[in-house]
A protein has these predicted regions:
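Short helix/turn-capping signatures at newly exposed starts of structured segments
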Residues: 1-144
Length: 144
C-alpha cells in the first residue's frame, strides 16, 4: 500500500514500512529474501533491485536507491508483476507494452501524473527504452 500523503510504502507480508528515513540496513534486515541485486556506484549511490509486495499477492519489480544512508528514490516497475517473488530479475519488455501496463497500474492509485508529499514526490515516467530508460513510477525523497 502507498500512503501518498506521507510518502510511505507499506509492504503486505512483512508490514515493513519504507519511509524517507529508511536506511539500507533497515531494508536489508526487513526483506533480505526479496532483494535480488545490490549495485554500489563509485559516486556513493547504492541501488537495491528487489521485489516489493505493495498489493496483496502481487510483487512489483523495484529499484531502491540510497546515497550513503539516505533514501534517495524508489523506481517501481509495475509492468513487471508476479504473484510470488520470482526470478532474480524480470525479462525486458517492449516500450509500448510496458507503458500501457505501467500507466494502468499508476492510474489505479493516483489521479494526477505528479503528486507531492511532505518529504518528496511521486510521478509516472513514460519510458523511452526498455533497458536504459524503462517506464516506471518514480518516488523521490528529500532529506530533512
Amino acid at each position: 500500500m502507498i500512503d501518498i500523503k506521507q510518502g510511505i510504502i507499506t509492504l503486505c507480508e512483512s508490514e515493513f514500512q519504507i519511509t524517507a528515513d529508511t536506511t539500507p540496513q533497515a531494508l536489508t534486515a526487513a526483506i533480505p529474501a526479496l532483494i535480488s541485486q545490490v549495485h554500489p556506484v563509485s559516486t556513493g549511490y547504492t541501488h537495491y533491485n528487489c521485489w516489493l509486495d505493495i498489493e496483496p499477492q502481487c510483487y512489483l519489480w523495484a529499484s531502491v536507491c540510497f546515497h550513503g544512508d539516505a533514501l534517495e528514490s524508489i523506481r517501481l516497475f509495475p509492468q513487471h508483476q508476479s504473484a510470488t517473488a520470482p526470478a532474480p530479475r524480470p525479462d525486458p519488455m517492449d516500450t509500448e507494452s510496458s507503458h500501457l501496463l505501467g500507466h494502468a497500474w499508476y492510474g489505479k492509485f493516483f489521479e494526477q501524473d505528479e503528486l507531492s508529499f511532505p518529504r518528496g514526490s511521486i510521478r509516472y515516467v513514460q519510458g523511452r527504452d526498455p533497458i536504459y530508460s524503462p517506464t516506471c513510477v518514480l518516488i523521490r525523497y528529500t532529506s530533512k
